[in-house]
Amino acid sequence: MIQDILKEAQDHMQKAIEVLKKEFATMRVGRATPALLEKVVVEYYGTQMPVNQLATISAPEPRLLVIQPWDKGALGAIEKAILKSDLGITPTNDGSVIRLAIPPLTQERRQELVKVARKKAEEARVAIRNIRRDANDRIKDLEKDKVISEDEGKRGQDEVQKLTDKFIKTVDELLKAKEDEILSI
């Protein structure tokens, strides 16, 4: 019983880490990566589609992204979607591809990005703590229903706490790496 609860809690905590990694990957840090455009959604023939489903995205240079749509008719829609996004990058359309020159970050923008990264890390920590609370509640319910002994319940809660500490530490490490990346460019 407790092992099932622990396994489920671990899976959920791992998902929270994966979400944080994705969030960090889409943050613009002055280096061109196709992941920057993951959240950009294009209105194409009346449907909302991610850019990566309409085009090939490559980074031929550290500060340049090239978007090559499979259908040239999508160029305008992709350009409009990038302009509407919160990336703060102006696309250049040459009729066959869209180029995104990634400008170097100002010190102010770096500080903003660090704040955003910290906020996202805190959201991940809160999610992990909520998972801990749910797991502990389930263990207490088993204890209350006399399915497990008090000692087993205590051991189970200790295991949940160890899991929580491990995943919170991972969040802190990811945040530290992201802050270093943002501030070092």
Curated annotation (Swiss-Prot):
Name the InterPro entries for this protein. Ribosome_recyc_fac, Ribosome_recyc_fac_dom, RRF_sf
Instruction: Supply one GO CC term from the record.
Output: cytoplasm
User: What cystine linkages occur within this chain?
Assistant: none
CDD domains in alphabetical order: RRF
Look up the record and give one Gene Ontology term from the biological process aspect.
translational termination
The main location class comes to: cytoplasm
Name the Pfam families on file. Answer: RRF
- Function of the molecule: Responsible for the release of ribosomes from messenger RNA at the termination of protein biosynthesis. May increase the efficiency of translation by recycling ribosomes from one round of translation to another.
> Which family, according to UniProt?
Belongs to the RRF family.
The protein's name = Ribosome-recycling factor
**Organism listed in the record:** Carboxydothermus hydrogenoformans (strain ATCC BAA-161 / DSM 6008 / Z-2901)
Organism taxonomic ancestry: Bacteria, Bacillati, Bacillota, Clostridia, Thermoanaerobacterales
Gene symbol?
frr
